[in-house]
Amino acid sequence: ECVVITAAVKVWRTYSSSSYFSWSLVTRGHQTLLTRMASGLAGQRYDLVVFGATGYTGQFVVEEVARTAQQERSQGKVPLSWAIAGRSEKKLQDVLTTAKKETGLSLEDVGLVLADVSDQKSLNEMAAKSNVVINCVGPYQLYGEPVVQACVENGANHVDISGETLFMESMQLKYNKAAEKAGVHIVNACGYDSIPADLGIRHMIRNFKGELNSVEMFVQTSGGSSKSAIHTGTMESAALVIANRSKVGAIRRELFPTPLPKPKYKVAKKGFLYKNDTLGYWGVSFPSDEPVVYRTQRYRHEMLGERPIQFQQFIRMPSLLHGAMLIIGMAYFFLLSSFAWTRNLLFKYPDILTAGLFKKAGAERESLKNLKFTVTQIGHGWSEKLAEGSDEYASPPDSSIIVKVKGPDPGYGATSIMMVSAAMTILREKSLCAEKGGVMTPGIAFANTGIIERMCERGMSFTVEQEQQKN
C-alpha cells in the first residue's frame, strides 16, 4: 500500500498543475484505488454527475452514460469526464462493478462523489463539481427541491425524470428567475414523462407545412411479462401526484395569472374511454404529460407568438373491454392514493395491493429486454400558415399528420436514453438551448437542438408515419 500511495502522490504532483484534472485516493477495504476526480483547485467540473446512482433507475442511467461516453470516444469527440454520486462509497463502487459487467466497458476513470439529499452542504459541494447534474433521486416531491436549489446556487445545470406536476411547477415558480440569473438550465420531465409527448409534437411541427391546431397521443407498451414489474419509486411518485392534486391550482394561478386565449376551433375533451376512428384505436384518458405540454405551448405562445396546440393523451387499449378494466384499476389506485392511511398501506405492501404490478425490487433485467413502447400522435391543422399566430382561420383544420416515437422499455432503458441525451444536449449544445437559463420543459429547452437525432443514435426513433395530407 505504501508503494501505491507513493506512486499516487507522484502522479498527483505531475498532474495537479493541469487545468483539467487532479487526483484523489479512494480506499476500498485493503485496496487503494486511484480515481480521477474533477479538479477543485483549478475550478474544473465534471461534465456529468449522476446523483442517486445507487437507486434502481440510477443503475440504468450510469450504464447509459458509460455507453454514451464510449460512443463519444469512438467518434473522436472530446472525452467525457463524469462521476456518480450517492451516500455510500461502497454502494457506488458496487454500481460501477455492475455497470462494468453489463456494458463490458472499463470504468476506472469514473469519479465518486459522496452526497446526501438530507445534507445541503454535500449537495452544494456536488453541484459545485458538476456541469450537469443528472438527478435520479425521487420521488421529487419529497427530495427534489434541495438538489435544484444546490444546482441554482452553485452554477450547475440539472435534468430529472419527474412527472410530478406540483414539484415541476413549484420549482418554476420558486427558482426560474434565479436560474436565469445564474445561467443554468433546470429541465424537468426528461424521461418517458414527458419527452415522447413534448418532443414528438416538436418533431411533428418540423414536418407539418402549415399550422397545427391539436394533437391526440396514444401510448402503448408491448413485449412485457409477469416479471416486468414497475419499481415502487414510480408508484410512490404517481401516488403523491394524486395526493397533492388539490395544491396544483394555487401554484398554477400564481405562475400563470392570465389564461391562454380560447381557440376558435376548440377540440372537445374526450371521455375516459374513447375511440379514434382515424387510427382505429381505443384509448383511456391518461393526462400525465398534459401539464408539461401546456407549459411548453404557453411559453411558445407568450414568447414566440405561436398558436397554442391543444393536446390530449390516452393509453392505447386493444378493445373496449380492456379499456373498461383499466379504468377500474385506475380508480382503485386513485382511491388508495387519495387518503394518507391507505397510501401508507400501499407504500408498505405494494406487491400485495397492486397484485405484483409494482415491486420494491423492480423488474428482472431479462424481462425488460423484449419490452418496447410506441407513442402515436395524430395532429390536425391547416395546410397554410397565417401571417400572425394571433390571426384566426376562416375554416376548420383541413390537414392531418401522424408521428410515431418508439424505443426500448419505457421505464428504464428508454428513460435512461432520454435523460442522458438531455444532459448531453445541455453539455454539448448549451448555446442552442432556450434562453440563457431557467426552469423549463424539454419542449422549451431543446426545441432548437439536435436532441432528437441524439436519441435516435442511442436506439430510439422519431418518424412521420403518415405525411401531411388533406382531410
Task: Tell me what each language-model feature is.
Residues A127-C136, H158-V159:
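N-terminal Rossmann-like NAD(P) cofactor-binding module of classical short-chain dehydrogenase/reductase
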Residues V113-K129, P139:
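Conserved Rossmann-fold cofactor-binding substructure of NAD(P)-dependent oxidoreductases
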Residues Y46-A69:
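N-terminal Rossmann NAD(P)H-binding glycine-rich loop of SDR-like oxidoreductase domains
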Residues G138-F256, S288, V292-R295:
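Glycine-/Pro-rich loop/turn segments that contact NAD(P) or position catalytic residues
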Residues G40, R206-N471:
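C-terminal catalytic/substrate-binding lobe primarily of soluble NAD(P)-dependent oxidoreductases
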